[in-house]
């Protein structure tokens, strides 16, 4: 956002975000760093975390409308890469479609290397929570629907960029299973998706490039694949200075 048109023009905005860390056994210093214009990490936030503090919330997740599927179950989550695929834009009557789509995309995932030869190192979970309405928002067509994760096309001004700013709903739904990576499976025929490194990625289910889209967006969110779209527009401007070598592969 900061390098997009609004951010560059001084329009400020806040984003709800989450950091996932192992539960500490003792007090720790929690530090956040960000890269400066020279691509060097600089500390910008620090706090102490005491796992025994009375202010550590220990709520248990509970929602009778949520159903969990396990299309790939290879054992102890502590020893596997755990991927959760969240349902978005599926109504209660479309649960079977979610399951069919889930199994189809899991199949696509393991057609590709290095995942194909490492399948035993993964667990994949599907988490279904019905939306009130089917699909996702299309602001350019004046279409807005009521869905669980509030995804939308035209994110950050890019027509094909399909994302959500509702981090809280996404994390609350993902919390029903162990996870290292989050996919949002959006029930829609239009081509679109997105991926943010160490955050989440999205993809639509029913377009002709769905197989490519599924693995491509995972590359952005899980393996740090860089944006190098010199043939098409992106949602930001001059993210890297010409004199700086990106760290992304």
Where are these regions (language model features)?
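Beta-strand-enriched, solvent-exposed domains that form extended recognition/catalytic surfaces
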Residues: 1-61
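Structural recognition of the beta-strand scaffold that forms the well-ordered cores
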Residues: 82-86, 123-126, 181-185, 213-214, ...
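Solvent-exposed loop/turn segments at secondary-structure junctions
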Residues: 89-92, 130-134, 188-192, 208-210, ...
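Short pre-active-site segment immediately N-terminal to the catalytic Zn-binding motif
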Residues: 97-98, 193-217
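Active-site-proximal segments of metallohydrolase catalytic domains
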Residues: 121-197
